[in-house]
Amino acid sequence: MDMEEAGEAAQPAPLKVLVIDDHQAHAEGLAELLQLAGFDASYVQTGAEGLAVARERNVDAVLLDMNLPDMNGFEVCRRLRRDPDTIGIAVVFHTAQGSVPGARHEGDAFLTYPVAMSEVYAVIRASVERRRKRMAAFL
């Protein structure tokens, strides 16, 4: 193995992030910005799609809108937490509506827009790290 191959092998895989937001332009824009920042990002527009894709893609984190057309963010989070295949996913709620009672207790983090994308990236990374530590403590 040469130095270039060794460097590539040492690079961690990008974090997989799923944006769940019913506003297509917002969801698509967030996913694109996350990709530019080195995340493996995709998006869906409903809670049901989010639950299925989170499971299929084995994502590390979801950036979850509070208000979706088929279920609210709390319900999506609860379903992720009840499923042994998705319990380890970090949940970062996001909304433009200001504070949402209980959001900090349900998910791993809460963001209110407008927010700097650098903060979004940092919160996602920190939430994934905390979630992984919590999950490791239970194993």
Model regions and ranges:
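Active-site residues of response regulator receiver
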Residues: 21, 65, 95
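Short acidic/polar segment at the start of the alpha1 helix of CheY-like receiver
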Residues: 23-27, 68, 117
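Acidic catalytic/metal-coordinating carboxylates
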Residues: 46-49, 72-75
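Alpha4 helix (beta4-alpha4-beta5 surface) of REC/receiver domains from two-component response regulators
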Residues: 75, 96-113, 117-125
